[in-house]
């Protein structure tokens, strides 16, 4: 995409946004486009669960991706298949896709993907919401001379809604519990994130 914008300078005036599919790379790799072309919106599209890949327990994966998208200036996050059956059908592509929701073909029973559970943490966000990345005080990082390679930490974003309420959406993708502190409204808040959890904390106005 970057080369297209450089090769065709008028392109930035002919479109108002860029959509990225969930096939390769990372969300952070697209941030420079937002920095260089602030008038262009970024959209995450066509990202959905797979039936064989922790279908109903990968809420941390999706919550983390949504948080990263919001923190990197994305305007929207769109899934893929709304509802499929237990075999991933009807399947018109080469991948064994899962739906946001699965409906059992024989019993009609519904089951819900980890992505579905992740989306629930962002249901209050609108186009008017203000998003801010979160930064935490971590005593552990001050006590060690170096960070442990590959260690996962709790990440999150702060959402200011037009209703006046403020929310923080958090995800701890680690296998270890993490205790964090967050300073908000002249007060320190203690938050304990259990392993493999997502949480939303609401500060009511």
What kind of region is each of these model predictions?
Residues 1-205:
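Substrate-binding and catalytic surfaces of secreted/luminal carbohydrate-active proteins
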């Amino acid at each position: 995409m970057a080369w297209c914008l450089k090769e065709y300078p008028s392109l930035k005036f002919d479109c108002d946004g860029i959509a990225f599919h969930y096939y390769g790379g990372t969300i952070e790799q697209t941030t420079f486009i937002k920095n260089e072309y602030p008038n262009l919106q970024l959209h995450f599209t066509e990202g959905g669960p797979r039936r064989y890949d922790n279908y109903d327990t990968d809420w941390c994966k999706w919550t983390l991706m949504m948080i990263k998208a919001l923190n990197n200036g994305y305007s929207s996050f769109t899934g893929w298949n709304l509802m499929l059956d237990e075999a991933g059908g009807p399947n018109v592509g080469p991948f064994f896709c899962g739906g946001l929701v699965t409906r059992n073909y024989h019993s009609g029973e519904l089951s819900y993907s980890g992505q579905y559970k992740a989306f629930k943490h962002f249901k209050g966000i609108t186009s008017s919401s203000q998003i801010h990345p979160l930064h935490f005080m971590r005593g552990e990082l001050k006590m060690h001379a170096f960070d442990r390679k590959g260690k996962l930490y709790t990440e999150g974003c702060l959402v200011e809604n037009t209703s006046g309420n403020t929310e923080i959406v958090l995800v701890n993708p680690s296998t270890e519990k993490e205790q964090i502190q967050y300073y908000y409204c002249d007060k320190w808040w203690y938050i304990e994130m259990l392993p493999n959890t997502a949480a939303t904390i609401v500060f009511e106005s």
